[in-house]
Amino acid sequence: MQIFPQTNELIWTIINFAVLLWGMHRFLYKPLLGAIQAREDEINANLKKAAEDRAEAERLRREFEAQIANAQREAQEIINKAVKNATAVKEQIEAEARARAAEILEQATQTIEREKAKAVAELRREVADLAVAVAGKVIEKSLDDAEHRRLADSFVTEVTKH
């Protein structure tokens, strides 16, 4: 008596199933695992490359930021030097202008003094000439008081004209 009436069929089904599993394992599972492993390796390589690229990008960003900071510092130094040079040039121009103004003022003062001295000398010469002329007139005439007064007034008027 058989426990299962179709035991032969069951055994052949189990054998067929085992052969199918073995074939699938040999021809499908291993290549599928290889493809999955290759894909996993590719993804891991891509992730590793992305991490390396990210690290390189971060390094470049820091390097560029350092270069920008350096360029800004150099630009500020150039600006500071330009301002310092401009201030020095301004101070030099102002000093030269003050010196030139003092020189012009000194020359003008000297010219005024010379002209004043000339005018005083000329006035003295004219006064002396007039005094000599008046003395000559006085000597020529004998003057009374009224004539003397008129002559003095004439002398003063002539002096004030010149």
UniProtKB/Swiss-Prot annotation:
Keywords: ATP synthesis, Cell membrane, CF(0), Hydrogen ion transport, Ion transport, Membrane, Transmembrane, Transmembrane helix, Transport. The chain crosses the membrane at residues 10-29. Signal peptide: none annotated. CDD domains: ATP-synt_Fo_b. It holds the Pfam family ATP-synt_B. InterPro entries: ATP_synth_B-like_membr_sf, ATP_synth_b/b'su_bac/chlpt, ATP_synth_F0_bsu_bac, ATP_synthase_B_chain. One of its GO terms (cellular component) is plasma membrane. Its main location: membrane. SUPFAM superfamilies: F1F0 ATP synthase subunit B, membrane domain. One of its GO terms (molecular function) is proton-transporting ATPase activity, rotational mechanism. It is found in: Cell membrane. It is a single-pass membrane protein. PANTHER family: ATP SYNTHASE SUBUNIT B, ATP SYNTHASE SUBUNIT B', CHLOROPLASTIC. Belongs to the ATPase B chain family. F-type ATPases have 2 components, F(1) - the catalytic core - and F(0) - the membrane proton channel. F(1) has five subunits: alpha(3), beta(3), gamma(1), delta(1), epsilon(1). F(0) has three main subunits: a(1), b(2) and c(10-14). The alpha and beta chains form an alternating ring which encloses part of the gamma chain. F(1) is attached to F(0) by a central stalk formed by the gamma and epsilon chains, while a peripheral stalk is formed by the delta and b chains. F(1)F(0) ATP synthase produces ATP from ADP in the presence of a proton or sodium gradient. F-type ATPases consist of two structural domains, F(1) containing the extramembraneous catalytic core and F(0) containing the membrane proton channel, linked together by a central stalk and a peripheral stalk. During catalysis, ATP synthesis in the catalytic domain of F(1) is coupled via a rotary mechanism of the central stalk subunits to proton translocation. Component of the F(0) channel, it forms part of the peripheral stalk, linking F(1) to F(0). This is ATP synthase subunit b. It comes from Symbiobacterium thermophilum (strain DSM 24528 / JCM 14929 / IAM 14863 / T). The gene is atpF.
